[in-house]
Amino acid sequence: MSTIEDLKATVERLAARVHELEASAKSKIAPEVPKSIRMVLIGPPGAGKGTQAPNLVEKYCACHLATGDMLRSQVQQQTPLGVEAKKIMDAGGLVSDDIMVNMIRSELENNSKCKNGFILDGFPRTIPQAEKLDEMLAEKKQPLEKAVELKIPDDLLVARITGRLVHPASGRSYHKVFNPPKKEMIDDITGEALVQRSDDNADALKKRLVSFHKQTEPIVGYYQKTGIWKGVDAAQDPKKVWGDILKCLGQ
């Protein structure tokens, strides 16, 4: 009798050991690397780029290249391109397309967060910029895969943007009504203060929208011709917008 009980105990110990080994093997399997992404995010101020870009960064482990923030960062760090750009801006000029494209190239080559791809935000704004960007990416054998446009009526944008709050360091955006931070005027991630931009008022926005539409319609046409453009209704709830973006990206 004791022999049978001993055998049962041995079998149970072996089964437990097998279970431990299987669990250990699973834990050592390398985590799945997300699919890479190379895209442009197009949309007027207030369309939700600052809300959706962090979702894309987290989903694809890619870098968010908001060109305005990138330009400010390069100037602050006094990189060769930043120094050159500052001279132009101090003289009241516009930073050239070549400088902006080279800044993007620099980020792709030196920013470790860009290893799995990038989300470009705020560039290109003209067809010559789009062509220069395509040339640079072709040289690097990293062509754009998607251009996603967040589409939204202007009148809704005015309501949205006048309540917008921004975390300056990261570019994360919130809204007092539609997407409030957990704590009033405080960034959810860092605990740092949020700000409301001085140009986030109705009159300033309407002027920016006129400029945006004039610039962007040709860009949308450019990417439609190349076959990588997709449009998303950005007037929906942010979670629904996110789901539609993933569909555009084949997820």
UniProtKB/Swiss-Prot annotation:
Description of its domains: Consists of three domains, a large central CORE domain and two small peripheral domains, NMPbind and LID, which undergo movements during catalysis. The LID domain closes over the site of phosphoryl transfer upon ATP binding. Assembling and dissambling the active center during each catalytic cycle provides an effective means to prevent ATP hydrolysis.
UniProt xrefs under NCBIfam families: adk, PRK00279.1-2, PRK00279.1-3, PRK14527.1
Entries under CDD domains matching the protein: ADK
Family: Belongs to the adenylate kinase family. AK2 subfamily.
Keywords for the protein's UniProt record, in alphabetical order: ATP-binding, Cytoplasm, Kinase, Mitochondrion, Nucleotide-binding, Transferase
Binding site for AMP: 67, 72, 93-95, 122-125, 129, 197, 208
Gene Ontology cellular component annotations, sorted alphabetically: cytoplasm; cytosol; mitochondrial intermembrane space; mitochondrion
The UniProt record lists the keyword Mitochondrion: yes
Protein's name in the database: Adenylate kinase
Origin: domain of life: Eukaryota
Source lineage: Eukaryota, Fungi, Dikarya, Ascomycota, Saccharomycotina
SUPFAM superfamilies associated with the record: P-loop containing nucleoside triphosphate hydrolases
